[in-house]
Structure formats: C-alpha cells, structure tokens
C-alpha cells in the first residue's frame, strides 16, 4: 500500500479560485497565508491521516479530524518556527471573526458536525472551513502533550528535544521538505513508517491524503 498527499497550488488556480482564497485569507499576503496553511501546517495534518491508516486506526471521522489537528499542532510546537505558529494562530482567529458560526444554540461543536458529516451541508467552503479552523484553534487551546497524542495514534515517542527543527521558507516548493523532516523525526523515535509522496495539483481546492494499492 502506498500513501500520497495531494496539494493544490494557489498560483495555478483560476482567477475565480484565487479570488475565493483572497476573500478567505484577505487581499494582503494571500500567497503566503495560503502556503502557511496548506504547504506548512496542512502537510502535517494530512500526514496524520496517513499515519492512522498505516496503524489501521479506525475512529469516528470527526474525532479523526480533531486528532490529526492535535497531532499537527503538537508537532509544530516541537519542530517548527514559533513565529510561524503565531502568524498561523492570528490568521485563523481573523478568519473566524468573519466566518458565521453555523452551530445551532444548544448543540456542541462535535455533536453538530457528526450530525452533518458526509452530507451536502458540510461540503461548502464556509461550513468545512469553519470546522477545520475551529478544530485547529481548539487543539492549540487544549495544548495536549505530544507524546500522549502519538500514543493515541499508535506511535512511539522518543526524546522530543532531539527532533530536527524545520526552519525553511514557507512555500509550495518546500512542502516536500516539510514532509521529509517530519518523517525523519518520527522514524527517529523508532517508528517504522512507509514512504509518503507529495503530488501537486493545479486546483488549489484539492487538499487531501490518499492511500493506494
């Protein structure tokens, strides 16, 4: 079985697609913000999905998204640039200030999204974006112990201070090195992890992880 992270580029999107991301991220530094989310943070998020698949972990899909966001946040707190994390957190907070909260009064976050998971109601930029951005900020707020997160995912955790730091520029071109360093760090802990490749797509709306035979 092989694993692949497919990630679209902002710069190859249509004018309409780019305009949509400008509306989401703002007109200033849209390219950087897109890359910060999708080619820095989200590479580790999608890696989390691959790792759960490798470990044959089958959990509720909403819980899986929450777990891989906790994994990505925890990873970057140990292996990332703290300035990037601050920029990332600030960016998410700014976006959520303008994205309407769709959760009905009296319903919990996870309860609501479990009720609409897999439906057309979820498949809008505003709805799914609210879910993902909110769950990332929730992971930042909870600040779970990274070793506990790895254990929950069925992975070994070694000396966190020995992790290799990633400090390259945030660009689409560096997405492969983001993944390479993360795999190196996880293998350093004694985890046997299959190779994972990155495939770039012209469509910036395509962001996912696939496993194939």
Please place each PLM-identified region on the residue numbering.
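Post-HExxH zinc-binding segment in Zn-dependent metallohydrolases
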Residues: 62-96
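Active-site recognition of the HExxH zinc-binding catalytic motif
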Residues: 41-54, 65, 69, 73
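Generic structural signal for hydrophobic core residues of well-folded globular domains
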Residues: 47, 51, 75-76, 116, ...
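Pan-zinc metallopeptidase signature
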Residues: 103-213
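Soluble non-cytosolic domains of exported or imported proteins
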Residues: 30-38, 42, 58-62, 66
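Structural signature of transmembrane alpha-helix termini at the membrane-water interface
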Residues: 51-54, 79, 197
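Short, flexible helix-coil linker/hinge segments at the edges of structured domains or between repeats
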Residues: 13-24, 92-101, 105
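Active-site scaffold of zinc-dependent metalloenzymes
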Residues: 1-35, 50
